[in-house]
């Protein structure tokens, strides 16, 4: 498609979304829930159509040599469709954040001042090969009163377009504008380039994908992003750690799932407990197929480990590889995380309350844990019900981004004729 045609098509999507966002701002909670329930029913009723569209994507992906793990994410099995439908119903059951107000403050002149939660407006979602994100993102944006433009990966185009039709049918069943959720129907990368610069139509972009995609968007976007580049997460075993807690937390933080952004990538161990804790932990990791890359002091205790380089401290492996460093103090652990961490999720294992409080205060990450594995970095685990992603931004949303993260606050004041003298 010529660049001028893509620009025209994207601008039309943006104009439609902006118009729909005004209607969504007025939508009742009952109407939004009706739409979500209708979508869930339509997913189950139209699974044959969905799977036929998905088969086109799978055939093309196989022919193109897509990795098996990515092929699995692409597949809309019966189980995957049922999961998406259940997810829609779960979002429908969540409290509606729109219109809620903070406690009001009574000013000396008698006026009341409060804040009201309102939608962000129009959200662009850019993601890679998982078609379930089409449903997840549509559900959260709809429930939070936003319009959204969805641009999925080229591998899932047919699946995403088919899912988009189901979402729009659900919106229409609830008398809501179909344009509140629109799927970009081209694989041309120029569409992404246009989307991330349409400041007059798009209020925020949420990218879901690999580091390369997000880095590109961060460098080129004119629209604000809610994002994280990577999840280089740390667990620090303090001198005052309970040995059994340290073992189970560190092991779970790494082995729960290697490919999630909350997986531990570097283990920091206080020198005072390294000799007593590391050998058993290293044996458990070895038995689980995890390769250890250690500092010189780690190699003295775990000779089977590979020597670590500075690149290892900076790497999000998303694989059964773990960097291990022995540190002399809490100060050194905090300094290491400040230098090499990504601001995602970091944890301390300790029975020392003052050390725990200091770690949580001084480690500048979006989530900081005491005596918990980093793999809890997930909106569902936080009680958010669902999440659009995890943000390491300092402005607006930080950490797992649920419904409230897709809203903002406006000031609302009530008076009785007061004037300013």
Curated annotation (Swiss-Prot):
Biological process terms in GO annotation: L-proline biosynthetic process
Reactions mediated catalytically: L-glutamate 5-semialdehyde + phosphate + NADP(+) = L-glutamyl 5-phosphate + NADPH + H(+)
Compartment(s) where it occurs, according to its Swiss-Prot or TrEMBL record: Cytoplasm
Primary role: Catalyzes the NADPH-dependent reduction of L-glutamate 5-phosphate into L-glutamate 5-semialdehyde and phosphate. The product spontaneously undergoes cyclization to form 1-pyrroline-5-carboxylate.
NCBIfam families linked: PRK00197.1 (NF001221), proA (TIGR00407)
HAMAP family with a match to the protein in the record: ProA
Domain of life, source organism: Bacteria
Database matches in InterPro entries: Ald_DH/histidinol_DH (IPR016161), Ald_DH_C (IPR016163), Ald_DH_N (IPR016162), Aldehyde_DH_dom (IPR015590), G-glutamylP_reductase_CS (IPR020593), Glu-5-SA_DH (IPR012134), GPR_dom (IPR000965)
GO molecular function: glutamate-5-semialdehyde dehydrogenase activity; NADP binding
Keywords: Amino-acid biosynthesis, Cytoplasm, NADP, Oxidoreductase, Proline biosynthesis
Pfam families registered for this protein in UniProt: Aldedh
GO cellular component terms attached to this protein's record: cytoplasm
Name of the protein in its database record: Gamma-glutamyl phosphate reductase
E.C. no: 1.2.1.41
Enzyme class at the top of the EC tree: oxidoreductase
Pathways per UniProt: Amino-acid biosynthesis; L-proline biosynthesis; L-glutamate 5-semialdehyde from L-glutamate: step 2/2
Gene name for this UniProt entry: proA
Annotated family: Belongs to the gamma-glutamyl phosphate reductase family.
